Amino acid sequence: MTDTTGRIPLWLIGTLTGILVIGLIGIFFYGSYSGLGSSL
């Protein structure tokens, strides 16, 4: 992990993107399961 060229590391971007995607999918499925996703 020494490939830090002054920008944000690629693994950090991938990790944050994965967490956001999993969170959005989880919220979407939880909302549809609770009956709140029908308004979306």
UniProtKB/Swiss-Prot annotation:
Compartments, record wording: Plastid, Chloroplast thylakoid membrane
UniProt keyword Plastid, yes or no: yes
GO cellular component: chloroplast thylakoid membrane; photosystem II reaction center
Gene3D superfamilies membership: 6.10.250.2070
GO biological process, one term: photosynthesis
Annotated transmembrane regions: 8-28
Record's keyword annotation contains Acyltransferase: no
Disulfide bonds: none
Keywords carried by this UniProt record: Chloroplast, Membrane, Photosynthesis, Photosystem II, Plastid, Reaction center, Thylakoid, Transmembrane, Transmembrane helix
Membrane topology type: Single-pass membrane protein
InterPro entries xref list: PSII_PsbJ, PSII_PsbJ_sf
Function: One of the components of the core complex of photosystem II (PSII). PSII is a light-driven water:plastoquinone oxidoreductase that uses light energy to abstract electrons from H(2)O, generating O(2) and a proton gradient subsequently used for ATP formation. It consists of a core antenna complex that captures photons, and an electron transfer chain that converts photonic excitation into a charge separation.
Complexes and interactors: PSII is composed of 1 copy each of membrane proteins PsbA, PsbB, PsbC, PsbD, PsbE, PsbF, PsbH, PsbI, PsbJ, PsbK, PsbL, PsbM, PsbT, PsbX, PsbY, PsbZ, Psb30/Ycf12, at least 3 peripheral proteins of the oxygen-evolving complex and a large number of cofactors. It forms dimeric complexes.
Family: Belongs to the PsbJ family.
UniProt-recorded name of the protein: Photosystem II reaction center protein J
Organism of origin: Phalaenopsis aphrodite subsp. formosana (Moth orchid)
Gene this chain is encoded by: psbJ
